[in-house]
Structure formats: structure tokens, C-alpha cells
Amino acid sequence: MTNCEKDEEFVCISCVEEVRYSFVSHLSEALRRKGINNVVVDVDIDDLLFKESQAKIEKAGVSVMVLPGNCDPSEVWLDKFAKVLECQRNNKDQAVVSVLYGDSLLRDQWLSELDFRGLSRIHQSRKECSDSILVEEIVRDVYETHFYVGRIGIYSKLLEIENMVNKQPIGIRCVGIWGMPGIGKTTLAKAVFDQMSSAFDASCFIEDYDKSIHEKGLYCLLEEQLLPGNDATIMKLSSLRDRLNSKRVLVVLDDVCNALVAESFLEGFDWLGPGSLIIITSRDKQVFRLCGINQIYEVQGLNEKEARQLFLLSASIMEDMGEQNLHELSVRVISYANGNPLAISVYGRELKGKKKLSEMETAFLKLKRRPPFKIVDAFKSSYDTLSDNEKNIFLDIACFFQGENVNYVIQLLEGCGFFPHVEIDVLVDKCLVTISENRVWLHKLTQDIGREIINGETVQIERRRRLWEPWSIKYLLEYNEHKANGEPKTTFKRAQGSEEIEGLFLDTSNLRFDLQPSAFKNMLNLRLLKIYCSNPEVHPVINFPTGSLHSLPNELRLLHWENYPLKSLPQNFDPRHLVEINMPYSQLQKLWGGTKNLEMLRTIRLCHSQHLVDIDDLLKAENLEVIDLQGCTRLQNFPAAGRLLRLRVVNLSGCIKIKSVLEIPPNIEKLHLQGTGILALPVSTVKPNHRELVNFLTEIPGLSEASKLERLTSLLESNSSCQDLGKLICLELKDCSCLQSLPNMANLDLNVLDLSGCSSLNSIQGFPRFLKQLYLGGTAIREVPQLPQSLEILNAHGSCLRSLPNMANLEFLKVLDLSGCSELETIQGFPRNLKELYFAGTTLREVPQLPLSLEVLNAHGSDSEKLPMHYKFNNFFDLSQQVVNDFFLKALTYVKHIPRGYTQELINKAPTFSFSAPSHTNQNATFDLQPGSSVMTRLNHSWRNTLVGFGMLVEVAFPEDYCDATDVGISCVCRWSNKEGRSCRIERNFHCWAPGKVVPKVRKDHTFVFSDVNMRPSTGEGNDPDIWAGLVVFEFFPINQQTKCLNDRFTVTRCGVRVINVATGNTSLENISLVLSLDPVEVSGYEVLRVSYDDLQEMDKVLFLYIASLFNDEDVDFVAPLIAGIDLDVSSGLKVLADVSLISVSSNGEIVMHSLQRQMGKEILHGQSMLLSDCESSMTENLSDVPKKEKKHRESKVKKVVSIPAIDEGDLWTWRKYGQKDILGSRFPRGYYRCAYKFTHGCKATKQVQRSETDSNMLAITYLSEHNHPRPTKRKALADSTRSTSSSICSAITTSASSRVFQNKDEPNQPHLPSSSTPPRNAAVLFKMTDMEEFQDNMEVDNDVVDTRTLALFPEFQHQPEEEDPWSTFFDDYNFYF
């Protein structure tokens, strides 16, 4: 965002001028590092008009007030502070954070004033902690209590977006962010923008794209966003192209609804430079299709943990409300919101302020009944873009079809005249409907808002188009006549249904009433009628007091009436539009009398209608596909249905009086005859295209003609000859307990033979030659004949096998399951292409050499401990503890066979492995796992040269009694910064259980071990990986098979990393450096570099700063004697710096430092200068020495002008430079200084310094006012190493310059100044002005801090402290003079 005023989430810091460029600058930078880029520093607090400041503060999300602790809380300050509080009252959502900065005995007075104004969020500077700790506390407070709420759950999504961007080829990359309203698309896009924008030449974030384009126009919007501050107006796109041609640009278009407008926008930007990125957020996937964006990220809802955290923060709920009750309430809210951040936060804010749990529960029920306007508005904007048919389909689904089979819904809606195949896809694209597991689903909020649309159309129940609330339907249908006081019947007129009603779904679970006979008379347009009972334990009681139903609407497509109490449907009912009749447990004897038009009927279900005796009328339904008459015990015959060509399924199970079936349709797929009186099927019954016969038949002749029969289930016994099976593809004889043997089936074309559960089967003569899948689990077979070479799956789970034939020649065998074969003694060998091997619970003592292709090994409960040494193993459970502890160390050692001169080709062929074990089995293992889900390792120089890969150990906590862990895996993200300072990453996903395989019940937690040599940083020069400072960060996330994060169900509790080294095969088991509590944020190149610097010894830090400021690109031979002169060990120091990648030494002996390294060195010097000035200005003084506050009056200034040489020691006063400006007609600028004791002693002395026009070696100094304190008399350096380092650097500047002057031109790399020699006292005179100006350009810092370069040349500007420490004589000890 270019202007923070447009961002409702920015921080405004109010402060005084004195701390703006010291403490406040550090605070601002820390906020930006946390991702809060919009920070406004307001110093107008000194301005009593306060208008501009007030406007800024009112718009801010957080207002930070930095108060000077060393100033008396006078009326002036309190007035200013009151104005800040007034701004906060105008913005009730704004947070106010107070910071009391500076040591003072007036602290108690400030705290009293702040407490009086009701402010509890107060931070104070303390003697026992540094400013950096104070800054960290303030940033944490601001972020976690305000900004963090909006970004809960964003980090894992950022990783996925980043990965999606990185996978795209170089060029103009495009990513679409898609999701339902309120799911966090804009928040995620802003987070991506904040993280990535700094890496682009230009960037823009266009919020509410369609509205912005309409209001401002394309060119004006682009000029405002991409070229802020530009004077010229862009009239043509070509002008913008000329200014941004070939530049890397980041463009974010938020909330795009009109695909055509976005498409035209993007078509004009094919000239952007390679690496440009365009991100579009939309709730309509069709936008991405039209814009040609293939990489689409679907934003998922928050997991349970994140949702609860957001709810509690939004509602400001305290835990003292009762942990159990609070948990139940939060679960209900979270379950209803289903991970939608907008809904969770809105409901949380609506419940905010409710002190009692009962009040919150009541408020929540009201919110469910009438969702808040903000949520309704967000969802209704998508609804308003639909066509009329799409709206009708959406409302039908919202009111009636939640969770129904999508094919069932499509069939009904097609019968209503809609085009659901297309229109449901539109609803899915607009995030209003989802299809999961072949069922139609709506988010609970979406469903309630859809129903609210219906209820909002009219307050008259009888005129609402769709009815689903039982109480309102009962009101319309209930019989309304009764006797009063024994008098004749009195009729009370009630409102009856109208022709506006299109759908009526009545749940009778809690109802008991009489239905009036003419209840449906006026519902002429009723399409969908369903009367059902959702509670199977309740018997509904709905009666017809008159014993009749006068009519049903002729427009019905669905007639679903459970427990229908009458003997037939109304005779005047015309069912020509009916698509489905579903009337289970009815009292029907027949549907109706006579012949009806049933041309639209697709399904009829009359199951368990025990009075049904006649269904002959169904023969007229030529399009009928399903007939379900299960449990119709009085039905005696099934009519010849040969003419029903579309009939696919017939279920006559339980029709005990049916003795025969005369004719079966030719396209029948499923025929259920269990429990019938049918003993045999005639030959003409089995047709060539039958696919499945399900029945316990004693004889099925004619199977040789069934050329398309694919499944034959559960025969009691096999035929004496299997030749009648013809072209059968799948033979399933599962659980045929009486089957004892099978004949030779070598000539059959079977692909699948399932004999599972045939507990009496003890022999097989031969297998089909083309068999692919063989299931022998639970059989009594001890030996099997030669297996066919086409076999792909062999499952003998729990069988009595004792041996297997040699399987080495089975090239296609991929899965071998021998689990539970307790009698299995030997295995001769495995196929070379085997991928999955299961032998859990066997007694094998040795396992043959496993093939290279093996991916999964399940050894649960196996007695074998002599496992092979290679590759990837899963489900490694319940081995002895020693085996588990030793296996990882042994497995890592196996990579020692890789030669030292390895290549990428050899790395790609190197073994990888993984295994898992319950954590309780390795409690005594020395794995050194660290708490948390991330860990950072440091590689020393030798490791980096021979790095092969990493071994990773991850402990995952599973929920109690979690049974299905088949879908669990671990995503590992490896991050590092290359030597150019760019952040790099690689991600690999590891799954410990093969998809679709049943794994043993997991314990509470498991340790997973992975190794993959491809999981390593990319190679730099030679074999040295391109890793900056040797720091590599690993982060671990639990995922499912679709790589979706599972943090809501599983938790990574501990993790660890080991280095695989090619030279020795060792794994750095003891020397690896592990960093705990690593924040899960991207480690930038600067942060990696700073970590390396902070870990250096003090003298190595000094050496680095020397090189950063003076000796970049210099020869080592030139630098060494100069550095040695100040007692620094050059040889070891340079090696240390090179090992952590702070410098590098080229092949010709030059010290090379990249730009980011030099930048960090300058910033360190800059920061130390700030600390120096801060320390000088805030040194503790006796309170009695502080002059009392006097009335303001203008003092007369004492003016004195002197001229001194530029190298003179000066007046020995301590000055602080606060400005500089060019003087008209003068060659030299004028510097402005004030006494460093202005704020501690109230000293008003100032001076102006300018070089002489006639003699540039002379300085003209003008003194204004007198000092009110004694002149300092002694030299002193800061007690801490930071200041001493800064001082030593400053001192060396002059020395280095002098060395250059004495250098012989003929010997450029041989300095003539020996390390022990003492340069002349006036050596600084020889420092050329051009060198001085060049150095000033290279080391430019802010003008309002002490300039350490000037300190070196003008000692009179240096502070002369009172005491002395070991650093105070540093320069004198090494004979440095100025």
C-alpha cells in the first residue's frame, strides 16, 4: 500500500524530536520487521495546534505515545496527552500504548497520571534491561493485541503461496487467491504483499479493484499506485510502459468480480520485466480462467486451534468465566463458523462485553437466527451476481439438499427445468457450494444466509417460496376443526398455503398433529415435497382424521413421504412430472387405480411397505432406472420388466413370496435377490452385459454367455468346472466358508480373484494367466502354485502360508502383504520392482535383501531385527528399544559409500530412508530433539564443503485414541540465505504410511525420521553449497495426502536435524549447533548475517568493522600489517570471518565483501553512534544538579567567533551536531552543534562550524550563549564493547589514510609504515580532503547524531568523561595520535 492513510491498520508513534532518530527509529524498524510496514512517526506533538497530528492518530489502528520520563508531567504535557486520548475516543477500536522512556525519579508521577486516565498498557525503560529489550516488548504488545488478530493462521498459507510462486518459470508469474467471502483472501494478499514488495522495483496493491477502476480509471489508478509522487499525468499506457519497462513489478488486484475488466487489465502488461508477479484475489474462479491464471490457491479456513485463539481475542474473553463452559461455547461458535475468520471475529466482537456465560449463549442463538449485517452483506454480494436459475438452485440446495448426493440433486433439478450440470459448477466457482465425496455441501453461514434470504422476502409464512421450519409448516397443514362445549363443529379459518410455495420439507420428529385433507390444495406450484422423520427412534404421528387426502400438486417432482398412512395416493393426482417416488414404511396397497403417465419417473422406493400387493403400473415408466421393493413381504410377483431398457438396479431382498423372475432388463447392473423364494434363474435371465449378481443362489446356469459380467459375489460352492465362467473379469468369493477347493483356472480371463475369508479353502490347482490381483487373506492354504507373471498385488494377510515360490521374476508385483502369516518361515527373494512390503506380526528372523524400488516397509510386531540397511522404511513399530535407538545412527552411516568427489548424478542416486517408531521406545535415545516445530543449524566451513544432505527427526503428538493415521505426513521446509543475501528455500513432503493402507493404532506420539539427499541447499562454486554464514533453518508441519496442513489435529512437539557428511560418513552428532525457540518467520539475509556477527568474539567484531569501513577490496598483504598494529590476529580473524561468510578472500588475495555485508557494517556503526550519543545525553546526574524549571524568557545570546586549525584539539567541550546546510556564495557547508548536556543540564550553548573560504585547513567557529556546567576534564570511553569498537574504528580511519600517503607507488601492496612504528602527530594533516569526502560519502549517517568521522578529526567534539576503564587507553597504548 503506498499510502498508510488507505490502510486501516497502521501505527502512529507520537514522540518528541529528541528521541525520533534514536529510540523511535529502532522501534519503527522493529515494527516493520514484524510485518507492520505502515508506521507513521508524528513529532508534531510539540505543536499545540495539533490538527495534522490529530488526523493521523484518529486513523491509526494503534497509537504509541512515547513520553519523556525525564520531564515533569506538567500541564503542557498533560494537555498533549489528553488530545491523544481524545483521538482514541473517536476511534473506539484503536489501541493506545504508552511508553515512559528515560530514567527519572519523576516516574511515579507519570505512572500516577497514566493510571488516573485508565491506561494499563504502559512500558517503561529500566536500568536492568537495554533499549532493544524494551523495543521488543512494545512490538510484541502492539502485534499480538492488535495486528496478530487479523493474521492468525496466515503464516502456513504464506509458505504455500511462496512455494506456488517459486515453482513457476521465470517470466511474468501469476497467482490467483480464491475462497469464500470472509475466508481471509485480502488479509493473505496483504501479507504476501508486505513480505514480497521490497524485492520488486515497483509494487501496488489495488483494493476493491472493480470499484477503484470505476471511480478513478485505469491510468489514474496506475499513476497513483506504481508512480507515487509523479508530477506528470499518464494519459496512455505507453507512457507507463516507458517508465517501468523491463522492471520487476508486483501487482495485487484485490476482490476482482468482473473477469472481463481484469482480463483487459492484464493483457496490457505483457511488457513487464522477468520476475514480475501479478496476484489476483477473487471469490469467482471463472475470473482466473478468463485471465489465464492456472496457479490458483484455495484459501482454507482456520484450524481449531487458530479459530479458538481468534475467537478469544476478538471477544476479549477471560479464562475466569469457567474453563469447561468457555470451551463448550467456543467450540459451538467455532463449529458454526467452520474456520471462517470473518465470522469468528464478528461473532467474537458481538459477544464482547457479555460478562455471563448465559448472556453470551443467548446472544449467540440470536446471531444464528439473524446473522450480523457485515456477514450477510459479504455473502449476499456473491448471491446478487447469480442468474435467476442459479439463484433458484442455490436456494433449493440451501433449504433442502445440504449433504445430499450430487447426482440425486442433479436428477431432481433437471426435472424442474433447470440446467444443474452447468449451474452447480457456477455456484462452486463462486464459493457458494462445494462438492466433496460426491455430495453437495454449503458452509453453515452460507446455508443460513440463503435461508435468511427466503425468510426476508415476506413475513407471511404462507407466501414464502420454501418452507423447512416444522412449526411454520404445521401452522399451514394442521386440521383446524374441533368441537366447542359440545356444540357442532366450529371451523376456525387459518392461513393456507399459496401458489408461491415451491418446496416443503417437514421433519416430523417432534410433531404430533392431524393433517387437513385439503392441505395442498392451493400449493399449485409445489415442486418438492418431503415429509420425513430424522430421528429413527421416534415414530411420527400425523393422521388424516377424515381418512382421505383430497389432492396433491400436479407440479410435484419429488414425492417423499415416510410412513404414509393411506392405502393409495389421490386418484386425481397427475404424476406426469414426478422424478422420484420415495415412500418407505407406508400403508400403501397400490399407488393408484388405473394407468398414469410416468414418463419422467426415474426412481421408485417403496421399501418395507408391507401391505403392497400390486406394482403392475410401473411398467408404464419407460425411463425408470431404480426399483427398490426391499421388505415388501406381501408382494407375490415381479412383472416382466424387459421393456424397461434403462433399468439398472432392482432390489427384491426380503420379498419372500416372490418365487420367480420372468424377465430381467438387458441393461441391469445390480440384482438383489437375498431373502426371496427364487432358487434358480433361467438361462434367458443372464445376459451378455450383466455386471454384478448379488445373491446366495444355489445355481446360476448360462454364465458362459455373460461376456460383460464383471462381478459374481458369494457363491455357496464352486461349480465342478469353471468353464461356465466365460469371460468373467472379477471373481469375488469372499467369506464363502464352505468352499474347500478350486479347480484349475489357468484358461480363464480373470483379472481379480478374491478368496478372502474362505476359511475352509486349502488348495488351488492353478491361477488365471492374466491375473493381476490375488487376495488369499484368512484362507487355510499352506502352499500356492506358481504365481502368474502379470500379478501386481498379492495379499495373504492372516493366511496359513508356510512358504512362497520364488518371486524374483514377478516384474509387475508392486504390493506384497504377508502381515499376520504366523507360520511363514522363509522368503526366497523379492521382485525388483516391489514398492510396498508388509510383514507385521510374522516370525521371520531374516529378511532377504530388499529391492532398490522399495518405498514402504511395515514391520509392526515382527520378531526380525536383522533388517536391511538401505532405503525407505515406514511403520517401523514395536521393535526392541535398542534396535530403534541404533537404527538411525546406522542408517546415516550407510551413505559413507558416496565418494569424496561426488557429483549431482551420484547424489540423485544416493539412498534415502525414513522410518517411524512410538516415542516411548526411544526415551533413552540420544537424539537431542529440541522443543517446537523449527530448528536452525550452523554448518562449519568443512561441513559445507562436504555436505550431502540432512537427516531429520520429528516428533508428532497424536490425539488420544486416534485410529486413522493413514493420511498423515510431514512437510519439511528448508530455508537459507545465499551469498548474495537472497532468501532461498526447498520443500519436501514425507509420508510415513502408504495411502489406503491400514496402519496399527498409533500411540499418543511418534518419532518420524527422514533422510533425503535432495533436501539440501543448492550448490555454489565447486561443491561448496551457496549458504550464507552456514545457517540453515528447518520447519516442520503435519500434512495430509493433499499436502494440506493438519495443525488442528496433530502437533509437532520436538524436532532435530543431523548433517550427513560425505568425507567420513559421520553425522555431526555432537557438534551441531541448535537454536531453540526460533520464531516461525522467514530468516532474511540480513538476519542471518547479523546472527553470525553477534556470535563473533569481540576482537573479531572489531576486525569486521575495520574491513567494512576501510579495507573492502584491499589485498590481504596490505591489510595485515595495519591490523596487526592494533594487536588483532589477522590470520585467524580473517579465517573466522570467512567461515561464517562475513567476508570472502578471492583467488588473488583480495578481501571481498558484498553490498549487504557492507550495509550491515555501516548500520552497526550507525547504531553504535546512536548509543554513544544516547548514553552521553542520558548519563545519570544528581537530582540536585538539575536546574529547577523557570519561567520561559528569551535569554540574550553571547556571541564569540574564533578561527582554529582543522586539526586543533579545540575547546574540549562536548557537542552534538543537529544540522547542516549549504551557505549561499560559500564553497563549504555550515554545521550546527548544541551542547550534549542540553537535556540533562538545560545548557543552551550552541556553535556553528564552517571551513574558511581562504584557507580550507582553518575552521571558523561561532559560539552562541555560554555553558552552565563545568568543562569536562578527562577522557573516557564507554564501558561496553560497543562504544569501544566504534571508537577504535574511528581512530583507525586516520591511521589508514596516513598509511596510504607514505606508501611507495612502486610497491602498492607493501606498506612502509611498520606495525610498531608511530605515525607523526600531525599525520592527519596529510589526509587529503578528497579522501575525506569519499569516506564521508561511504559512511553517511543521519545529521542529528554524533558523527564519529568528525570525532576522529576534531577531538574537541568528543565527550570527555569522568572515569576510565581498560578501553580508555586503547589508542594511547598503540601509539595513535591525531
Swiss-Prot record:
Among InterPro entries, the record links this protein to: Apaf_helical (IPR042197), Disease_R_plants (IPR044974), Leu-rich_rpt_3 (IPR011713), LRR_dom_sf (IPR032675), NB-ARC (IPR002182), P-loop_NTPase (IPR027417), TIR_dom (IPR000157), Toll_tir_struct_dom_sf (IPR035897)
Record GO biological process: defense response; signal transduction
An example of a GO molecular function for this protein is: sequence-specific DNA binding
Renumbered ranges of LRR repeats? 498-522, 535-553, 554-575, 577-598, 621-646, 665-688, 742-766, 768-793, 831-854
Electron transport keyword on record: no
* Cellular localization per UniProt: Nucleus; Cytoplasm
| S-S bridge residues | none
Q: Which domain of life is it from?
A: Eukaryota
Q: Which residues bind ATP?
A: 179-186
Taking every annotated instance into account, which residue ranges of this chain make up the domain NB-ARC? Answer: 170-421
Any one GO cellular component localisation term in the record: nucleus
Tell me where in this chain the TIR domain is found. Answer: 5-146
- The annotated region (Disordered) lies at 1300-1321
Locus of motif Nuclear localization signal: 988-1005
State how it assembles.
Interacts with PopP2, a R.solanacearum type III effector.
Q: Other remarks?
A: Ecotypes susceptible to C.higginsianum or R.solanacearum, such as cv. Columbia, contain a protein with a premature stop codon while the longer allele found in cv. Nd-1, cv. Wassilewskija or cv. RLD confers resistance.
| Function according to Swiss-Prot or TrEMBL | Transcription factor. Interacts specifically with the W box (5'-(T)TGAC[CT]-3'), a frequently occurring elicitor-responsive cis-acting element. Also acts as a disease resistance protein involved in resistance to fungal and bacterial pathogens, including R.solanacearum, P.syringae pv. tomato and C.higginsianum. RRS1 mediated resistance depends on salicylic acid and NDR1 (AC O48915).
Its name, as the record gives it, is Disease resistance protein RRS1
Q: Give the species this sequence originates from.
A: Arabidopsis thaliana
Provide the gene name from the record. Answer: RRS1
